[in-house]
Amino acid sequence: MSRRIKKLNQLFRADISALLQKEIRDPRLDTLLSVNEVDISEDMRHANVYVSHLAGDEHKDEILAALNAAAGFFRTEIAKKTDIRYMPVFHFVWDITIERGVRLNTLIDQVIHHQPED
């Protein structure tokens, strides 16, 4: 991944987070929503935006529907203040890395506690 794409990933992550905090008025998108990562494709036409909710994935489908419906708004607002040739289309994806990490830690703890002592 090029240095430019890495910088844009960080910039878009910060911008989308700020827009979620200050501009979006959708009740499905509350302050417990977290933008974990942005991954722009090499041709810079698409970007996966990985999000999670601190309360878990109970309303995952509603949240993703609201975010993907607002993807054009995010793209337009970020394009206004960013000078790049191609503004990627944002695709919001549920980030399972935190849940996977918690599950892995639980499994490790179970193995440690069930080992016979020498």
Swiss-Prot record:
Q: Which GO terms describe its biological process?
A: maturation of SSU-rRNA
Q: Which domain of life is it from?
A: Bacteria
The record ties this protein, via Pfam families, to:
RBFA
Entry annotated with the keyword Cytoplasm: yes
How is this protein annotated for GO cellular component? Answer: cytosol
Chief location of this protein within or outside the cell: cytoplasm
Offer an example of a GO molecular function term for this protein: ribosomal small subunit binding
InterPro entries from the entry?
A: KH_dom-like_a/b, RbfA, RbfA_dom_sf, Ribosome-bd_factorA_CS
The record's section on PANTHER family has: RIBOSOME-BINDING FACTOR A, CHLOROPLASTIC-RELATED
Q: How does it assemble?
A: Monomer. Binds 30S ribosomal subunits, but not 50S ribosomal subunits or 70S ribosomes.
Q: Which family does it belong to?
A: Belongs to the RbfA family.
Q: Which NCBIfam families match?
A: rbfA (TIGR00082)
The UniProt function text for this chain reads: One of several proteins that assist in the late maturation steps of the functional core of the 30S ribosomal subunit. Associates with free 30S ribosomal subunits (but not with 30S subunits that are part of 70S ribosomes or polysomes). Required for efficient processing of 16S rRNA. May interact with the 5'-terminal helix region of 16S rRNA.
Q: What is this protein called?
A: Ribosome-binding factor A
Species: Dehalococcoides mccartyi (strain ATCC BAA-2100 / JCM 16839 / KCTC 5957 / BAV1)
Native organism taxonomy:
Bacteria, Bacillati, Chloroflexota, Dehalococcoidia, Dehalococcoidales
